[in-house]
Each structure stands twice: as structure tokens, then as C-alpha cells.
UniProtKB/Swiss-Prot annotation:
Ranges of residues in domain AMMECR1: 1-191
Matches recorded under InterPro entries: AMMECR1 (IPR023473), AMMECR1_dom_sf (IPR036071), AMMECR1_domain (IPR002733), AMMECR1_N (IPR027485)
Descriptive protein name: Uncharacterized protein R166.3
PROSITE patterns cross-referenced by the UniProt entry: AMMECR1
SUPFAM superfamilies assigned: AMMECR1-like (SSF143447)
Taxonomic superkingdom: Eukaryota
């Protein structure tokens, strides 16, 4: 099984630094395996680790290409936030999540908080709605199963009444992830210790 490693998060920092500094794209490090996996890239900011962007894909993408694409998409094109600025980069933390072990479930409580992420979709009579939480979200927020599912329904944009009938009608897939988190200072330390050029 491929696990998230520090070079993946270093590469994500390199990618957004190159974009912000209008430099050429960095090469994919040899330590990033040439395999295809679903992935998410998450940016958080400051001591409180406030979310600044989180976007990914459930499609199998070659890791180097996927990390490049979603490092930029989550940093600059998450519609919930303004694009990350050059001035913010030193306060950032990057999280790389490689998604594995997808399993459809038939009971909305059939997943483990802190271990499983959940992806759900349903038809509200007007449109199909979908949303996802990565495995760490429910635990970080202190939510139980019902609260997590209800927040997921709201995240999908649904504003109607939520009850057990709706929860039980959801199509839910649980999954796990291999995650690596890297603060900017550790990114700089990594670059220095490996004799790599520092960002401007």
C-alpha cells in the first residue's frame, strides 16, 4: 500500500510557491511513487489551524499529477475561501490524504469516528446532492455519527428537514486515508537539510 510521505507535502508547497512567484513548475520528486490513487490536499493556517482550502478527487490520478493539480486547486480555487496569497504561505500547514479501502454501507452509523471518512449522495427530488468528510473531520469537530451525517447533508447544500428517513436513504461510502501533515517551518527545514533551494 502506498502511504503519504513528507515529499508529497513538500512538493505541494513547492507547487504553490512556484505559482505565486510565477516560476516554472517544480519536477515531481522521485520519492513520489508513480501510482494512481484518489487524493485530497488540505491547507490550514495559523496556530488554530483554520481551514484555508481542501479539495481532492475520488478518481485514480497519477500521484505527481494529482498532487500538482489539487495543491493549486485547493489553494487558489476553493470557492469557500479567497485564494491563498504569497504573504500567507509562511503560516500554512499542508495535509496530503491518499484515499483507500472504499466500502459501501447500508446503515449511516456503520463507520468509525477517527478511522473512516464518509462520502454520501442522495436525490432531494430536484437534484442530486453529494458531499464528503475526510476521516479526521468528525473527530476534530467532536461530532457523533448523527451530527456528522447532518453536517454532511448541509454541506451538500440541502436546506430541508433532516430526519432518520432521510439519513437512512443516503447512499454512503466509507473509506480510510493515509495522511501526512507538514507545517511551513518543517517544509523549510526539510529543504535546508536536503540542500534544496528555499522559496523566495
Amino acid at each position: 500500500m502506498t502511504s503519504a510521505n513528507i515529499q508529497m507535502a513538500v512538493y505541494c508547497f513547492d507547487v504553490i510557491n512556484a505559482q505565486l512567484n510565477r516560476e516554472k513548475e517544480p519536477p515531481v520528486p522521485k520519492e513520489i511513487p508513480n501510482v494512481k490513487l484518489p487524493l485530497f490536499v488540505t491547507w490550514k493556517k495559523g496556530h488554530q489551524h483554520d481551514l484555508r482550502g481542501c479539495i481532492g478527487t475520488f478518481s485514480d490520478l497519477r500521484l505527481g499529477e494529482g498532487l500538482n493539480e489539487y495543491a493549486k486547486t485547493s489553494a487558489f480555487h476553493d470557492s469557500r475561501f479567497k485564494p491563498i496569497s504569497r504573504e500567507e504561505v509562511p503560516s500554512l500547514q499542508c495535509g496530503v490524504s491518499l484515499l483507500i479501502n472504499f466500502e459501501p454501507i447500508h446503515n449511516f452509523r456503520d463507520w468509525t469516528i477517527g478511522r473512516h471518512g464518509v462520502r454520501m449522495n442522495f436525490d432531494d427530488g430536484h437534484r442530486n446532492r453529494s458531499a464528503v468528510f475526510l476521516p479526521e473531520v468528525a473527530q476534530e469537530q467532536g461530532w457523533n455519527h448523527v451530527e456528522t451525517i447532518d453536517h454532511l447533508i448541509r454541506k451538500s447544500g440541502y436546506g430541508g428537514h433532516i430526519n432518520d428517513a432521510l439519513r437512512s436513504a443516503l447512499r454512503i461510502v466509507r473509506f480510510q486515508s493515509s495522511k501526512l501533515v507538514l507545517d511551513y517551518k518543517d517544509y523549510v527545514n526539510y529543504k535546508q537539510s536536503h540542500g534544496l533551494p528555499l522559496p523566495r
